[in-house]
C-alpha cells in the first residue's frame, strides 16, 4: 500500500465527510455500513462504538471528522461510508426483496427478512433537532406471521434535546459486539412498537472524576410485544450502557425485563420490585414482577497496543441473578479482523454461541413460567437468532473492492432446539445445520444497488429448501 500525501488526505477527507458534518438523526441496522465502520474502527482510523444500534448519525459524523487515514484504501472506505449514509437517509428510498425460500441457517446482524417477497417505500426528513423515517412495507410469503400483508416496520419519528435523541416507532435494535447474533437484544424478529432514548454524541464526561470512563453511550427502551398470546400486551423494558476507558477496550452492560401485560400487575411498585431485583418477594409467585435477562459484553482491540487490526469480543447474558451478578448464563465469543489488499478491504470473523444455561442446562434459556411464550415475539427470538438451547459456530469473510462490490462467503454449523420447544418457530424442531452462504452486492446503475445471495444447508428436519437464492434492490431518490 502506498502512502498518500497530507494534502490529498485533507482534501479527500473533507470531501468524504462534507455532507455528513451537519447530519442529524438515527441510523438503523445496516450490515454494509457496520462492516465499513468496523474496518476503520479496528484499524485506529476512527473511534466509534458499534455495539448499540440504532446509531446516532451525529456520532458517526464526529468520528469521520476526526478520522486519521494513512493509506489510500482507508480513504476509499471513508468515501464509501459517506455514500452509504447518503443512500440510507435519501429523501425517498425504494427497496425490494425476493427469494426462493428462507435460508436454512440463523441470520446475523441486519440480515433478517420477515417475508420471502417484499416491497418497501421509505420517506426521510431530518433537521438539527428532528428525524422522521416513514416506511410502508408490502409482503408476500411471510416467514414471520403478522396478521397483515402491509405494515410500517422500520418507521419512527425522533426529536433531539440536550444531546439526547427521543424516538417513537418500530425500530430494530442490537445490543452487543457479535455479528451472528446478540444474546439479549437482536433483530431476528419484527421490531416492536415503543420509545427509545440515547445520546446523540458519545463524548467522555467533562467532570474530572468521571472522565476516566471515556466515550460512553446509553440506550433506554420501552416497547409493547405484538401478538404475544400468553400475556397479551406484555412490555419489554430495557437499558444498556457502554463505556470505553481505553482506546483498546469497550465494556457494555445490558438488562431487559419482560413486564406487565393483560392480567398482570403493572403498578409502579411492582415495576420497582423488578427494577431493584426483588423478583421473588411475594408468597404467590404469580405476582413476580417479570422475566429478566442481564449481562455484560466486551471488545478488546489489538491495534492500539500491537498495531494488528484484530479484535476479540464476547458476551455473557444470564437468566437469573446470584450475588448481584447474572447467573444461568449464555455465552458468545468471537475474533474479527479487518485488512487491506491494495485499495480493497477484507473483513472476517469467527464466532461461537451457546444459548444453553451454563453451557449444559436445557429448557431454561428464553423461557418463563408466567410469560409462557418465552422471550419470543410471534415465535421469533428477541435475543439470539437461533433461540434458546442452541449452539453455533460460524465464520465469514468479505472482500469489498474499490468500486464497492462486496463478495462474501459464510460457513455455519449449528445445533438448534434440541427439545423441540414449540415457542421457537424460527427453528421448531431439533436439528443439526451445516450451511454455506455466498453473497454478492454492487452498484448496477449510479446509486441503485443489487444484493444477491445463494445458500446450501444440510439439515434433517427443516421445512426450508436445502438450496436457495435471493435478490434485493435498493433505489435511493433525492429531491
Segment roles from a protein language model:
Residues 194-372, 388-389, 393-395, 400, ...:
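Signature for the C-terminal beta-barrel architecture of outer-membrane proteins
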Residues 98-102, 127-129, 138-142, 161-163, ...:
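Transmembrane beta-strands of outer-membrane beta-barrel pores
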Amino acid at each position: 500500500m502506498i502512502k498518500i500525501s497530507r494534502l490529498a488526505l485533507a482534501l479527500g477527507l473533507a470531501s468524504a465527510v462534507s455532507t455528513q458534518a451537519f447530519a442529524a438523526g438515527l441510523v438503523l441496522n445496516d450490515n454494509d455500513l457496520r462492516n465499513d465502520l468496523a474496518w476503520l474502527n479496528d484499524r485506529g482510523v476512527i473511534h466509534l462504538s458499534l455495539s448499540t444500534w440504532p446509531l446516532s448519525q451525529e456520532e458517526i459524523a464526529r468520528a469521520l471528522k476526526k478520522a486519521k487515514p494513512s493509506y489510500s484504501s482507508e480513504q476509499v472506505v471513508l468515501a464509501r461510508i459517506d455514500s452509504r449514509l447518503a443512500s440510507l437517509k435519501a429523501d425517498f428510498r425504494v427497496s425490494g426483496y425476493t427469494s426462493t425460500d428462507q435460508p436454512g441457517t440463523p441470520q446475523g446482524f441486519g440480515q433478517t427478512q420477515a417475508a420471502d417477497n417484499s416491497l418497501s417505500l421509505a420517506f426521510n426528513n431530518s433537521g438539527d433537532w428532528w428525524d422522521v423515517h416513514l416506511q410502508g412495507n408490502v409482503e408476500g410469503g411471510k416467514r414471520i406471521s403478522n396478521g397483515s400483508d402491509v405494515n410500517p416496520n422500520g418507521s419512527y419519528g425522533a426529536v433531539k434535546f440536550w444531546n439526547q435523541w427521543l424516538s417513537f416507532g418500530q425500530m430494530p435494535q442490537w445490543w452487543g459486539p457479535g455479528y451472528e447474533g446478540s444474546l439479549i437484544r437482536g433483530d431476528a424478529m419484527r421490531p416492536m412498537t415503543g420509545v427509545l432514548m440515547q445520546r446523540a454524541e458519545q463524548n467522555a464526561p467533562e467532570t474530572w472524576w468521571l472522565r476516566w470512563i471515556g466515550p460512553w453511550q446509553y440506550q433506554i427502551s420501552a416497547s409493547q410485544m405484538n401478538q404475544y398470546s400468553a400475556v397479551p400486551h406484555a412490555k419489554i423494558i430495557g437499558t444498556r450502557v457502554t463505556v470505553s476507558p481505553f482506546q483498546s477496550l469497550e465494556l457494555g452492560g445490558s438488562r431487559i425485563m419482560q413486564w406487565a401485560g393483560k392480567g398482570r400487575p403493572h403498578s409502579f411498585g411492582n415495576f420497582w420490585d423488578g427494577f431493584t431485583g426483588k423478583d421473588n418477594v411475594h408468597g404467590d409467585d404469580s405476582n413476580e414482577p417479570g422475566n429478566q435477562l442481564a449481562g455484560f459484553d466486551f471488545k478488546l482491540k489489538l491495534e492500539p497496543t500491537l498495531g494488528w487490526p484484530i479484535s476479540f469480543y464476547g458476551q455473557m447474558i444470564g437468566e437469573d441473578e446470584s450475588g448481584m451478578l447474572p447467573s444461568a448464563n449464555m455465552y458468545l465469543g468471537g475474533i474479527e479482523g479487518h485488512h487491506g489488499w491494495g485499495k480493497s478491504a477484507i473483513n472476517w470473523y469467527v464466532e461461537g454461541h451457546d444459548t444453553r444455561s451454563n453451557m449444559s442446562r436445557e429448557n431454561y434459556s428464553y423461557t418463563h413460567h408466567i410469560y409462557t411464550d418465552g422471550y419470543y415475539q410471534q415465535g421469533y427470538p428477541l435475543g439470539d437468532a437461533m433461540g434458546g438451547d442452541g449452539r453455533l459456530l460460524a465464520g465469514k469473510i468479505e472482500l469489498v473492492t474499490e468500486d464497492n462490490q462486496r463478495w462474501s462467503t459464510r460457513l455455519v454449523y449449528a445445533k438448534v432446539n434440541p427439545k423441540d420447544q414449540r415457542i421457537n418457530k424460527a427453528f421448531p424442531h431439533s436439528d443439526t445445520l451445516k450451511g454455506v452462504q455466498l453473497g454478492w452486492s454492487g452498484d448496477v446503475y449510479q446509486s441503485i444497488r443489487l444484493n444477491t445471495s445463494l445458500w446450501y444447508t444440510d439439515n434433517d428436519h427443516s421445512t426450508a429448501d436445502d438450496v436457495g437464492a435471493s435478490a434485493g434492490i435498493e433505489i435511493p431518490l433525492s429531491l
